[in-house]
């Protein structure tokens, strides 16, 4: 009630969700949580929310999960790729990229022109976008916000919890390691060498530091698989914006030109 934004975890279709999110008694959680999520969303009014799922190597057909979530009445939807070290059986690998990229293209075609679904990764503000510091640094973990455990321990974000080398302090003892915070504050698309010449750098902002650490053992080294997926999502987002703006569209016209300054017939 007090939060301006909430994130609701649901992986999509019943069989997909229940495989990854069983309850403590081993049964599926789908039938338990879906009605509650629907009730919460119906009471949100104008407050923001997202239904967020995770797709793994076991459901690379995640476009169907987005469609399923939309069919449940959820307008704001996000599905994120599972990330992890090379031996993680669920994490998306380099060999999965052709299937994942094809699925993003399929999803873009399905969502073209639709107003009932707001897919997070295709919702890109190409005209304005985030502020400059966000474009350069991204989420701000460790320097703009932190995660605090029930014991009061402070970490750069929730994904670093349990990694003692990234424990920044404790709210009860009052200590705080500014050196760790400084390391995160220095991260940006220019200090991350792999990001400097990437065309997507001002929208990706260097990716997720926790994912970088998990995959490469270095918060400064981007996860190459995640980078490829981000570029594909942005490509789809740009295409959808271009189509919505009528750029290059010649359907139902006799004109083959994409430059409307060549003639004035379209304005007649």
Task: Report residues per predicted region.
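Flexible mid-to-C-terminal extensions adjoining Fe-S/redox cofactors in radical SAM and related proteins
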Residues: 161-268
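Structured core elements
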Residues: 7-9, 50, 78, 138, ...
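Radical SAM/AdoMet-radical enzyme domain recognition
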Residues: 1-82
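Short clusters of hydrophobic/aromatic residues that line enzyme substrate/ligand-binding pockets
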Residues: 17, 119, 139, 168-171, ...
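Short, flexible helix/strand-to-coil boundary loops that buttress conserved ligand/catalytic motifs
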Residues: 21, 158, 208
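Short acidic/His/Gly/Ser-rich catalytic and metal-binding motifs that mark active-site loops
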Residues: 14-18, 86-89, 207
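A C-terminal junction/extension of Radical SAM enzymes
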Residues: 87-163, 203, 254-255, 259-264, ...
């Amino acid at each position: 009630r007090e939060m301006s934004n909430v994130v609701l975890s649901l992986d999509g279709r019943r069989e997909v969700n229940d495989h990854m999110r069983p309850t403590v008694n081993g049964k599926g959680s789908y039938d338990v949580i879906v009605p509650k999520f629907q009730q919460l969303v119906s009471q949100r009014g104008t407050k923001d929310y997202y239904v967020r799922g995770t797709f793994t190597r076991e459901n690379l057909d995640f476009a169907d999960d987005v469609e399923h979530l939309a069919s449940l009445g959820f307008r704001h939807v996000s599905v994120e790729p599972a990330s992890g070290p090379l031996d993680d059986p669920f994490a998306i690998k380099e060999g999965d990229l052709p299937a994942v990229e094809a699925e993003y293209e399929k999803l873009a075609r399905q969502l073209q022109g639709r107003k009932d679904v707001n897919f997070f990764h295709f919702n890109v503000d190409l005209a304005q976008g985030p502020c400059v510091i966000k474009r350069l640094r991204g989420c701000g973990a460790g320097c703009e916000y932190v995660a605090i455990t029930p014991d009061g321990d402070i970490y750069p974000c929730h994904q670093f919890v349990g990694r003692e080398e990234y424990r920044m302090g404790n709210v009860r003892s009052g200590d705080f390691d500014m050196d760790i915070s400084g390391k995160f504050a220095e991260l940006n698309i220019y200090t991350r060498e792999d990001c400097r010449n990437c065309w997507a750098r001002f929208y990706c902002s260097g990716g997720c530091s926790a994912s970088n650490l998990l995959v490469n053992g270095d918060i400064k080294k981007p996860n190459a698989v995640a980078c490829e997926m981000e570029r594909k999502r942005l490509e789809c987002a740009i295409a959808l914006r271009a189509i919505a703006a009528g750029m290059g569209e010649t359907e139902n016209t006799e004109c083959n030109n994409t430059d409307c300054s060549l003639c004035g017939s379209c304005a007649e």
